[in-house]
Amino acid sequence: MSKAATVPVAFQDREKPQEVRLSNIMAARSVADAIRTSLGPKGMDKMIQTGKGEVILTNDGATILKHLSVLHPAAKMLVDLSAAQDVEAGDGTTSVVILAGSMLACAEKLLKKGIHPTVIAESFQRAAGFTVDCMKENALAIELSDRESLLRAATTSLNSKIVSQYSNLLAPIAVDAVLKVIDPRVATNVDLKDIRIVKKLGGIIDDTELIPGLALTQTAVKSAGGPTRIEKANIALIQFQLSPPKPDMENQVVVNDYRQMDKILKEERQYLLNMCKKIKKAGANVILIQKSILRDAVNDLALHFLAKLKIMVIKDIERDEVEFICKSTGCKPIADIESFAEDKLGHADLVEETSSSGEKIVKFSGVKNAGKTVSILCRGANLLTLEEAERSLHDALCVIRCLVKQRALIAGGGSPEIEAAQRLLEHARQLEGREAICIRAFSEALEIIPVTLAENAGLNAIQVVTELRSRHANGEKTAGINVRKGIVTNILEENVLQPLLVNISAIQLAAETTKMIMKIDDITLAR
């Protein structure tokens, strides 16, 4: 009798909390299943039609989930999880959601065995810490001077995108862009605001290029015969309007004499001429005019005067471009004609309008006193391709940023997950009771990455994962799935590498989200 009393009684949850947990798990898993097919180089793409009727073609996890219409609060947690991974690492947004879905599936089995949710949550958290340590042990330290390693990481990121056939062109652009805006010896982070991706419809992705400094899609105004090429340019960015002043309130001015009308026109003409002369006197020969929603930023008469004074005009500069332009050209924004002075101008050897694949852009070359900025001119035959190329480039830039933050690479192809799963199983054998069962379940959850990679490549997932387990048990720590050849190989020899930070962040964020969902026992509607 006493023997029976010492056996721990299985956790019998109250009916409602159990239902809530299972409902949350089911909702979250449905989100993970929705994007599971888009993982890896052989993953499928999703076509999304937004509420406005726009069409998006992508296989980027964060983009898919951002546009997903999700109602269940637990499912929204997985959408937020993907967004958090995008902010932290910029890549691995699909993997993190798939991992969380797999962890929740294993947690559901443990709940049905009668293990308490808190025990599951805490065991998973410890297992995640053990997995991170295991991955750090197997990571390869790199230096930012090792351009080849940076290229391999950027190429691996691009290989799973729609634009994968252009990875040989886009990977060097991403690497060079990041290295141009940081000091590799001391940098610990990269501000991606210093790298501007300029989209221009036309041409093909092969025409994408890296431009040191500044490139604008807005073209020079030629309607009044203004110049399109200026050497030894003095650049001014103005935030006021070159058009006749208007009263702030709605007023009506009644003119009943043609001489008064003539006087008004003469005053307007003189007002604009004086403004243009002040600009010329300050030495500016290129002016960028910020877009105005109140009235015309520049009128035809002002353009005529500026053309006569041989001043190049580029209008419709967006508000969010101002900071980048100022940093790139060394100029300061000018809010009023009275504060127009030479010390607020930027200087460049050449500002010219060039034509590329039938489209015109303005390039600034030889900029003096410029901050560390670069522009990437992204080209594409249609809007869908162009936007996906921009997203892919952003992911590649984020991968290089990860390597600046944490200078270590890890093998891809499901290799680190299988290695960590094997190590967790060994660790679980040294433990007793429910924690050992939970850690075994966590190791099973990690195997979802190689399983999904194999399934998406059309391989036999059971056969591939069994071979991976066997190879890792025999000490082949870098054995992974070669999706291109459809076999298990030493993945390092195939140059399939990714930043350690991407994997670590994915494991930690997925485990935290699983823990949060496991701890929820009720959903209450607020008034």
Swiss-Prot record:
Pfam families: Cpn60_TCP1 (PF00118). Its main location: cytoplasm. Transmembrane segments: none annotated. One of its GO terms (molecular function) is unfolded protein binding. GO terms for biological process: protein folding. Keywords: ATP-binding, Chaperone, Cytoplasm, Nucleotide-binding. It comes from the Eukaryota. It is found in: Cytoplasm. GO terms for cellular component: chaperonin-containing T-complex; cytoskeleton; cytosol; nucleus. Heterooligomeric complex of about 850 to 900 kDa that forms two stacked rings, 12 to 16 nm in diameter. Belongs to the TCP-1 chaperonin family. This is T-complex protein 1 subunit delta. It comes from Schizosaccharomyces pombe (strain 972 / ATCC 24843) (Fission yeast).
